[in-house]
Amino acid sequence: MNTAIQAALDHAVQTLQQEGVLPSDWNNSSNLTRTKDRSHGDFASNIAMIGSKAAGMKPRDLAEKILAALPEVADISKAEIAGPGFINFFLNADQRFAILDQIQAQKESFGRSQSNVAKKIQVEFVSANPTSSLHVGHGRGAAYGMTVANLLEATGAKVDREYYVNDAGRQMDILATSTYLRYLELLGQNLVFPKNAYQGDYVKEIAQGIIDKDGDAYVREVANVYKDVPEDVQYAEELDSEGNKVVLSGDKEKHIDGLIANSQQLLGEGYRVFHQAALHAILDDIKDDLADFGVTFNQWFSEASLSAKIDEALETLDQRGFLYEKDGNIWFKSTEFGDEKDRVVKRRNGQTTYFASDIAYHLNKLQRGYTDLVDIWGSDHHGYISRVKAAIDAMGYDSKKLTVLLVQFVSLWRGGEMVQMSSRSGQFVTLRDLRKEVGNDAARFYYVMRKSEQHIDFDLDLAVSQSKDNAVYYIQYAHARICRMLEKAASTGLQFEVSAARSHAARLSLDAETEILAKLAAYPDVVLRAANAYEPHQVGNYLKELAALFHGWYNEHKVLSDDAELTQARLLLSINVQQVLRNGLELLGVSAPEAM
């Protein structure tokens, strides 16, 4: 219906342009939206307020001219001017009921569209280092990324979900060396475990797996492993005035780097055993965790596979005049594209930087023919956006193809108090822990119920409560309530048939029923807006509102009654609410239970 109204408004604009009321080059950027207040009609347009300046008249005066030029629109009973110049459109009664036919015809496809069918979009998300289990912060990125991809697919786009595996960086070397040191410990070697190594018990488990397979084949003298390694950091017993550790001596970074270098030299090809064992153990754990969470990927892209692409990317930048040498390092002229300073892409020792790998990865993405790239990063990567976009432009591509969405941190609350997010050894509360406590549905729902750049205070008590304050429970309960109602109707021998019930739809005359019909009709617009804005919370809020309307109506008015026609009409309304709730929950990755 909104398409027909918009077409009529466009026709009116063309007429007014021909009459000289509006400039011929005026671009109509107005919005046509569903009204929240039923007294304001079904749709409202701000076209007169947007065009008043160009027309040189007051918005209400322009609105009158637009109405006069507006062609007749089928199923619109009236259009009127309201407030400072809004034009409100009222549907006739039959058109309001048409949404019931549309939902029943489209079923699980209702709300989906082909609006973005021309787009091929890659959504890269989570991409956590495979060095430990996913924590609750990663969980938010997983839920958000998966739901954004779902929404884009629902609007017709071809979507690829990708996880970038950081399997070639320093953190993996720290994990591999941590595993090797635990391996030596388990085989009876005495050593002081580095403060900057990975401390978790999972490292010992990986090391034990290597022992079970290869025994003591990789044992080397501990003295040689620690030979000429700089001293590890030593801290004072007391913290400073701000609660931070006070360094007495040593350097934890240089210490672990020395251990990495010695381990690589002593083990030779054997070092890869520890590197790969650690990588695959953690990556398999991450894959299992995400799959259990309903988050899947088309591709797990290995950073280690980018070696040739890094050379290609740097050569491209060099040929285009955007690299230079200084102090033995190779620098990218990112300041020419608005970055705050130039960035090193290759160090004097010949090693390329993580940024160089990121440039190569985005070159690879662009060469795969995507119309749009969506990167979902943690909020601490905010400063990284400008340099990546600069590199894309410098290589001759359009950085506008890249959208970077930042995901803020998550705080857990229980009993009105913030939960300690990490232990003394730095182990964070894991996604698996959260899922075990509140379930997948609550986690998937509450993770996306705020804009991604907003902090989330995750109330663990609320997430498991069975009350209307728990939004996901309230929505699921509405769906289950309708299922139970249909079962009850069937058990009494009531014959319900959609086409027959449709003939009694006019009995849905209560304000509450009209409001539910309008809310159902708004669903496709909500999905499209949520997809284009990358805002899943719009769907979540819509479902909350629809569930609240249904519960309020159900509590006040009997659905199964002695009035056969009214019963049929209300059952028809209910099954349409049920369908839309199910469709929306599916987009959010939340189940629609039939009983609760």
UniProtKB/Swiss-Prot annotation:
A Pfam family:
tRNA-synt_1d
Recorded hits in Gene3D superfamilies, A to Z, give:
Arginyl tRNA synthetase N-terminal domain, HUPs, Isoleucyl-tRNA Synthetase, Domain 1
**Main localization, broad class:** cytoplasm
Motif 'HIGH' region positions after renumbering to this chain: 128-138
What's the Enzyme Commission number for this chain?
6.1.1.19
- Per its UniProt record, what CDD domains does this chain match? ArgRS_core
Any one Gene Ontology BP term: arginyl-tRNA aminoacylation
Indicate whether Cytoplasm appears among the record's keywords: yes
Q: Which organism is it from?
A: Acinetobacter baumannii (strain SDF)
**Its quaternary structure?**
Monomer.
Tell me the compartments it is located in: Cytoplasm
Q: What is this protein called?
A: Arginine--tRNA ligase
InterPro entries the record matches? Arg-tRNA-ligase, Arg-tRNA-synth_N, Arg-tRNA-synth_N_sf, ArgRS_core, DALR_anticod-bd, Rossmann-like_a/b/a_fold, tRNAsynth_Ia_anticodon-bd
